[in-house]
Amino acid sequence: LDLAEKTAESRDRALCILETLICWYRDLLIWLESGETGFLYNPDRSEEIRREAGSYDARRLVTIIEAIGAAKNKIEANANTRLVLEALFLRLAGLVAPV
């Protein structure tokens, strides 16, 4: 929750971090489903993506991406950034644990 407080200090920074997280988990999903690097946002991190993707199933990755996207939308709609991030991080704590 300290991370939520620090990140919430700048709304724009929070949105940037959330977009980065969406891209990361999207890359994990793309790799998991296709094994291809051509569609990755971060092809230079393909080895790390390959290793990390093995810890998730597709359904969990979609849920994570949707949760982050929903939080991003709330912040863009002027919801309290800190509260949105705290709720997101608590939700993600149960989702990003290894399968």
At which residue positions do the language-model features occur?
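AAA+ P-loop NTPase domains with strong preference for DNA replication initiators
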Residues: 1-59, 66-99
